[in-house]
From Swiss-Prot:
Alphabetical list of InterPro entries matching this protein: FAD-bd_PCMH, FAD-bd_PCMH-like_sf, FAD-bd_PCMH_sub1, FAD-bd_PCMH_sub2, MurB, MurB_C, MurB_C_sf, Oxid_FAD_bind_N
GO molecular function: FAD binding; flavin adenine dinucleotide binding; UDP-N-acetylmuramate dehydrogenase activity
Family the entry assigns: Belongs to the MurB family.
EC number(s) per entry: 1.3.1.98
Subcellular location: Cytoplasm
Protein name: UDP-N-acetylenolpyruvoylglucosamine reductase
GO process terms (BP): cell division; cell wall organization; peptidoglycan biosynthetic process; regulation of cell shape
Keywords annotated in UniProt: Cell cycle, Cell division, Cell shape, Cell wall biogenesis/degradation, Cytoplasm, FAD, Flavoprotein, NADP, Oxidoreductase, Peptidoglycan synthesis
Gene Ontology annotations for the cellular component aspect, listed alphabetically: cytosol
One family name in Pfam for this protein: FAD_binding_4
FAD-binding PCMH-type domain sequence ranges: 17-187
Protein role: Cell wall formation.
Catalytic residues (positions): R163, S232, E327
Length: 347
């Protein structure tokens, strides 16, 4: 392993904002991870494991070590009823989805073009167009930082929720995802009840769903390689049935979906209807085609993004009485932070 000192983080996160890390290293094996996390030499140094850096914003320079997960490899097994994949944590997620479609393996096509690595998928329980990671998860393997051993969790043990998992709670900063196990029924059924997939026929093919999802994302979502962004910036808020009924009276065209604990309201709709598409602070801007995305127009600072996010949050609350929660992870100088904490520090 080669450790970079004073590394520029711009190439390592999709917002593409200039920040530095005291140290940065690429891990290509579990032994690399063990050496970094479990040896006395590095024990006291703050560490952050990243994949593609596609769901994070570095709010300032990072004083610890950035560990880039580049564990690679895909193993495929099958029986009469199921395809099973064992995927290393550093595998590129969009490439994995594309590979599955090429192999005729259905189940991931709704999750096409979500930037990131396989190891990040269970942490966030990524989802799109009616499918979440938990729906295809068989197990997750992780390096336990307390024991230095690789452990396996079943899907149920991962405690998946909406953009949530055990890795954000009980195992936060105690685990590094090394691999995921995926399970796909050969009796594939398309999930086409959401958005632009609704007009696909029930007898459509895996490739049809994949192409539609890709076309939709490329039309509505900016390419991070061209315009820096971290995808959906805010979570879709879940509100009670009573609160939704009140909201519907004033806004009968509100976009929402049933959820386990109430109604999930489209955050993009809330931001759009608050008149914030194209709203800009410094080099940070609400994307004119997709209000849920904040983009770096080329010279944005982290403060620009944070100020814009806070402004969006306040305006949406003023309009609808709904507080948006950011989906993007905020990384401070040595640990994860959040918008409320950042705002209190500015006061």
């Amino acid at each position: 392993m080669q450790i970079q000192l004073g590394a520029n983080l711009k190439p390592y996160h999709t917002f593409g904002i200039e920040q530095l890390a005291a140290q940065l290293v690429v891990a290509e094996s579990i032994d690399d991870l063990k050496a970094l996390y479990c040896s006395a030499e590095w024990a006291s140094l703050p560490k952050l494991i990243i994949g593609k850096g596609s769901n994070m914003l570095f709010t300032c320079h990072y004083t610890g070590m950035i560990v880039v997960n580049r564990l690679n490899g895909i193993e495929h097994q099958q029986d009469d009823d199921y395809h099973r994949l064992h995927v290393a944590g550093g595998e590129d997620w969009p490439s994995l989805v594309s590979w599955c479609v090429e192999q005729g393996i259905g189940g991931l096509e709704n999750l096409a073009l979500i930037p990131g690595c396989a190891g990040s998928a269970p942490i966030q329980n990524i989802g799109a167009y009616g499918v979440e990671f938990k729906d295809v998860c068989d197990y997750v393997e992780y390096l336990c930082l307390e024991t230095g051993t690789v452990k396996r969790l079943t899907m149920e043990e991962c405690q998946f929720g909406y953009r949530d998992s055990i890795f954000k709670h009980q195992l936060y900063q105690k685990a590094v995802v090394t691999a995921v196990g995926l399970k796909f029924a050969k009796a594939w059924q398309p999930i086409i009840q959401y958005g632009p997939l609704k007009d696909l026929s029930s007898d459509c093919a895996i490739h049809d769903v994949y192409q539609r999802v890709c076309a939709t994302r490329m039309e509505k979502l900016p390419d991070p390689a061209v315009m820096g962004n971290a995808g959906s910036f805010f979570k879709n808020p879940v509100i009670s049935q009573q609160a939704f009924a009140r909201l519907q009276i004033e806004h009968p065209d509100v976009v929402a979906y049933p959820a386990e604990q109430g109604v999930k309201v489209a955050a993009g709709w809330l931001i759009d209807q608050a008149g914030l598409k194209g709203h800009q602070i410094g080099g940070a801007k609400v994307h004119p085609k997709q209000a849920l995305v904040i983009v770096n127009t080329g010279d944005a600072s982290a403060q620009d993004v944070l100020m814009l996010a806070a402004d969006i949050q306040q305006r949406v609350f003023n309009c609808y009485g709904i507080e948006l929660e950011h989906e993007v992870r905020f990384i401070g100088e040595s640990e994860e932070t959040n918008l409320k904490q950042w705002m209190s520090e500015q006061a």
